[in-house]
Amino acid sequence: MRRIESVNDFVIKFANVNGTGSASANNLFAKALFRMGIPVSPKNIFPSNIQGLPTWYEVRVNDKGYLGRRGGIDIALSVNPQSMAQDIREVLPGGYFIYDDTKPLDLRLWRDDITIVGLPLSRLCNENYDDPRQRQLFKNVIYVGALAALLDIDFKVLTGLLEDQFKGKKNLVLPNTHALELGYHYAQANITCPLGIRVEKSDKVGDKILLDGNTALGLGALYGGATVAAWYPITPSTSVVDAFEKYAKRVRIDPGTGRRNYAIVQAEDELSAIGMVIGASWNGARSFTATSGPGISLMSEFLGLAYFAEIPTVLFNVQRAGPSTGMPTRTQQSDILACAYASHGDTKQVLLFPSTPKECFDFGALSFDLAERLQTPIILMTDLDLGMNDNMSAPLAWDDARK
């Protein structure tokens, strides 16, 4: 068998169960490579429930910066028995399949054309942790530590990321570092490291940052002068307002009184949310809402009101698959006509289409300027893929000329 061998050029896919804390560990892996200067493109593929169903996290690593998804998986790491048959089937010939071998692999899944690597993740957790919740959470961190040995990831980069993430919280840094060490030392002692696929430090990232579009939108709204947000939670747009609130708490505070200079209202439905935004705009505040396809359907009548009455209104539409309630955790760009001609009668709405987190930030701020200048609704169109996944992006820049 000829193994796949490469440096800084591969696709790895993590197979987990959602609600088990795997997202943080997988994100730690992607950020470690990025901090080593290697371009990465992570994609989170998750179900529309809270806990218990298969979820995947796919990372394309490419030193030349080719970050679109491609066919075939070079490395699969599976800790979910529900999806293991699918996961091992997706591995390219010569690739690597890593799994929790506390329980033996079903012989019907065995392949002679790939390298199969077992890690006793459950056993290591059972031996080192008494709390069932800790066993589940740290299992994910242990396999990241093992990957550090298997792929030759700089271990200091991983521990540095943990220190940044849990700054000032030694009670969290120490156990997570210990879990990384468990996986790292086990792999070094029991498996030939590194694999044929490995990483090494690079300078191809430059000044780029790793950021999701929704966070960039929240920052853009803040930068654009927004002081009012009214919304009804809907995947995949919810984290837009979460980000806006997170940063508004830092900068929208009156230095004299300590009072907040912003308002965020979680409305009872989408109709109320857009109504509050229009009302706030009518009173002179820069205001916005964030929603997805089903919300657009419900907000259309109010968008017609804002269009007819010439009220500046900003709406961020993070699109998902439809129609009807559709598939909340799958991406699609299917709301374009619904937004372009939102509401009945002769309407032609202004749409903005960012393609990167930097453009989400810039267009997010621009939306408020355009709405005020044109006295009309402005709808900014992104999608789940851009909104909820980390993307390499040019750094966000503050313009001192902006008032």
Regions found by a protein language model. Give the residues of each.
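Active-site cofactor/cluster-binding pocket
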Residues: 1-224, 228-230
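Thiamine diphosphate
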Residues: 6-91, 228, 235-339, 350-371
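Glycine-rich phosphate/pyrophosphate-binding loops
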Residues: 42-44, 154-158, 232, 291, ...
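Glycine-rich beta-alpha junction loops
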Residues: 103, 320-322, 374, 383-388
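Short, well-ordered, mixed-charge alpha-helical segments that flank or form enzyme active sites
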Residues: 105-108, 125-127, 150-152, 238-239, ...
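Conserved anion/nucleotide-ligand pocket segment
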Residues: 133, 138, 149-151, 358-361, ...
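Conformationally flexible catalytic loops at phosphate/diphosphate-handling active centers
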Residues: 186-199, 203, 378-403
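Short, flexible turn/loop "capping" segments at secondary-structure junctions
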Residues: 342-345
